[in-house]
Design a protein with these regions (language model features):
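Active-site rim beta-loop-alpha module in soluble metabolic enzymes
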Residues: 126-132
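Metabolite-binding pocket within alpha/beta catalytic cores that recognizes anionic/polar moieties
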Residues: 1-125
């Protein structure tokens, strides 16, 4: 499956879709992913706060969730969110695309890198490719 919906506050199901829960084990812990179909398209549905909204934002295991989606073969994800806006031009229930994002959270991991082999090459081993 190549598509996932990562749902935030207020979205715990998709009308007309039937899902089966799967617990995907990752090196960051288990993640609960619901797998099903929407209009013939197989998708993964991840309720970020849990299906009963029992997981507060600072307790969400983001790394396990993303790694689980990767293990399922997901290539693209649509994420929903329910936050306020500082612009009167974006009233409640608006559909918006985030172009800038500042993450001021603390107390949780912000990377998948845990040391060791990083996949980065020393500069003397790199080549520069330029496009015309």
């Amino acid at each position: 499956m190549e598509t996932a919906i990562i749902a935030g506050t207020g979205i715990y199901a998709i009308p007309g879709a039937e899902f089966q829960e799967q617990v995907i084990e990752t090196e960051y812990g288990p993640a609960l992913i619901n797998v099903g179909r929407i209009e013939g398209q197989e998708i993964a549905f991840l309720a970020r706060h849990g299906l009963q909204h029992t997981v507060p934002p600072h307790k969400i295991n983001y790394r396990a969730n993303i790694r689980a989606l990767q293990k399922l073969g997901v290539k693209r994800a649509l994420a929903t969110f329910a936050v306020g806006s500082i612009s009167r031009g974006v009233p409640p229930q608006s559909v918006a695309v985030v172009s800038d994002f500042l993450d001021f959270t603390s107390g949780r991991e912000h990377t998948f890198f845990n040391g060791g082999e990083s996949g980065l090459a020393p500069l003397d081993e790199c080549s520069v490719v330029t496009a015309p």
